[in-house]
Amino acid sequence: MKAAEIREKFLKFFESKGHTIVRSSSLVPGNDPTLMFTNSGMVQFKDVFLGTDPRPYSRATTAQRSVRAGGKHNDLENVGYTARHHTFFEMLGNFSFGDYFKHDAIKFAWELLTTVYQLPKDKLWVTVYQEDDEAYDIWAKEVGVPTERIIRIGDNKGARYASDNFWTMGDTGPCGPCTEIFYDHGPDVWGGPPGSPEEDGDRYIEIWNLVFMQFNRDAQGNMTRLPKQSVDTGMGLERLAAVLQHVHSNYEIDLFQNLIKAAARVTEISDLTNNSLKVIADHIRACSFLIVDGVIPGNEGRGYVLRRIVRRAIRHGYKLGRKGSFFHKLVADLVAEMGVAYPELKEAEQRVTDVLRQEEERFFETIEHGMSILEGALADVEAKGGKVLDGELAFKLHDTYGFPLDLTADVCRERGMTVDEPAFDDAMARQREQARAAGKFKAAQGLEYTGAKTTFHGYEEIAFDDAKIVALYVDGSSVNEVKTGQDAVVVLDHTPFYAESGGQVGDQGVLANAATRFAVADTLKVQADVIGHHGTLEQGTLKVGDVLRAEIDAHRRARTQRNHSATHLMHKALREVLGAHVQQKGSLVDAEKTRFDFAHNAPMTDDEIRRVEQIVNNEILANAPGIVRVMPYDEAVKGGAMALFGEKYGDEVRVLDLGFSRELCGGTHVSRSGDIGFFKIVVEGGVAAGIRRVEAITGDNAVRYVQELDARVNEAAAALKAQPSELTQRIAQVQDQVKSLEKELGALKSKLASSQGDELAQQAVEIGGVFVLAATLDGADAKTLRETVDKLKDKLKSAAIVLAAVESGKVSLIAGVTPDASKKVKAGELVNFVAQQVGGKGGGRPDMAQAGGTEPANLPGALAGVKGWVEERL
């Protein structure tokens, strides 16, 4: 039974039991910012279990895409070297939200395993929590599992309820016992049953975990029964497939074998047991689906994890002798394996391929030199009988050649060596310190300051007359004097300048007296309550102790305040229009615009955007006062003030009431909502799976935007010789004309193809009574290629044909074989023979197949090989 069939049977079985099939959620959790990646089926239902996300169903089933390659759940180092470690895996699960409980969950599992999948009952063992007599009795008395194959697992992790068979969501909250189902591979495989000293062997393999959310645990550790008891189960598709396909390694199942063969093809390796092929086959799944879900290779967070996985795959290809890019060529193979189950993968195929190709090209620019240095260093260490690579060298590889430490450690591990990571960390710390001292300041953090805190007057004033300099910094070092032309950071005892925080940019302005002028380009925090003014001394000298007038750029501040206050109103409006699930995930407020990232799973419609704009502008017209109060945090939240995820708040907080909005905020704002003037959303898009971004403008910027838009509408109307009010109708007419012209063009192409077909027929070569033709048809589209192939088949009577066309760097291929020849020459195999050489893959019927490719430079050679390929099969 193939993996695809196993997945389908699972979902269909639970659908027949009244479950709703729910699509896999994104690998980027939209409801749990504490998670790096979705790593289990229950992640998308966490809020459902907690009762904060009501759904129209009480039973659900999923095949959930999952990744474990960062943070707590990090299997990366073991991937490719063990039978069951993966970065990406599929978790099959069924869920009950206050519906059925232990009886049905256990009976469903047993029926599916023994009846649908037809696993031998005597091969299945189960574990239960030591105190869960209910589950034990269901297994023993109702299901009929012999008691010698039911194992009670106690508190084996050092504390009460700390057990492999007791699940918790956290220190407090929902929790409960679980029961696990194991498959016995038989006495020929080493290992003992769960709970025995030999349980880590491969004989008994856990295939399904059934979690019973039965209790709520409070802060004192007291357990009370939940009013709605729920079920969360998880079964790894790859593990189940290994059992059903009678193999002992997940890498031996059909899905992985096909990917391993594809990896062998692109790396030109014949040994399918090579661990590096397993690494590559695993990593193409994780990388492709992460990119599908909006993760892009980068230097931090999820992007960095993705980059690590990509580079590890590339390094294993390099190890196999592949010195050029190859990894991106596997995307088409993955789509062939998983594109039906996950159509989003097929839809994003080209984007995934492009991202991986770019990352490969970028890394291959550095890997060859870095690898030669690393291999030479390892040889030196081995020659001296050592086992540890110098951390300074590892840092050089990282700093100079972009070689990640984990990749260096991976190479060392294969040679039985380690990296001196403390020495690496020391070198990294020194480099950061040097960069901080040598570079121009972007931030004031890291400056050594031991004086008094800065008193901030910016909520009430735009200038302060008697501000005294208490510290000066040039190039990261404390100085007593700054000279004309120098960049510096100035710390004052009093200031009206707002330091960048909470998404609002820092103020600009001037520090001056009769002899001195310092232009402030940015304001940042040196410490939590110490403000640094970063800029350039344009006139005179500055000394510690000097007294200055500190004056902000009032016009810039006013525009920034308008945008910040509008952000609060927009946040509230988004929650009203889209739902209470909308949470701020990031923001940037400056004088030009407000940029707001928030949790939401779908693009906003035009109607939703208009409604948000209308709500905000109605609040602006109401001209409500901005009321600021300082109060204890708990009191503020209890009073309905919104606290933003990721922000840090002290015991005392600043609460802003502006119209219908109430938020905790330390930023600067308008006095009344009417001061915002006018609000307009100009951009809405996605920045990651489950995260949307809105950019909006206010005041004079918004008015200017509408005026420019109006001017463009008038220009477009003039170009189409219509009034602005007639634009929609006129555009529809133009579109109809274009369609008509395209139809005429298609007819002309068809005629051209027919005439070219007559010429091409004369190029066909007869082999064993079959005419063979492989040629390029200039300017043809896929439809024209198909029509030409059909006409050639009719003309030649007995033929095997491949026609190609190239447009915008992409290759289109069509293969056609007449019925008499298709018994020996399959069109699908023929087109794949050519496609694989031009960076693609395809398929179809024995008589007609199509494919694409991304490497047109290889097309002439690929077509030249068709004659020999066909000749071998006739």
UniProtKB/Swiss-Prot annotation:
Subcellular location, record wording: Cytoplasm
Keyword Transmembrane helix found: no
GO biological process: alanyl-tRNA aminoacylation; negative regulation of DNA-templated transcription
Gene3D superfamilies linked: 2.40.30.130, 3.10.310.40, 3.30.54.20, 6.10.250.550, Bira Bifunctional Protein, Domain 2, Threonyl-trna Synthetase, Chain A, domain 2
Location, primary (coarse class): cytoplasm
Binding sites annotated in the UniProt record for Zn(2+): 564, 568, 665, 669
InterPro entries listed in its UniProt record: aa-tRNA-synth_II/BPL/LPL (IPR045864), Ala-tRNA-lgiase_IIc (IPR002318), Ala-tRNA-ligase_IIc_anticod-bd (IPR018162), Ala-tRNA-synth_IIc_core (IPR018165), Ala-tRNA-synth_IIc_N (IPR018164), Ala-tRNA_ligase (IPR050058), Ala_tRNA_ligase_euk/bac (IPR023033), DHHA1_dom (IPR003156)
UniProt-recorded name of the protein: Alanine--tRNA ligase
GN (gene name): alaS
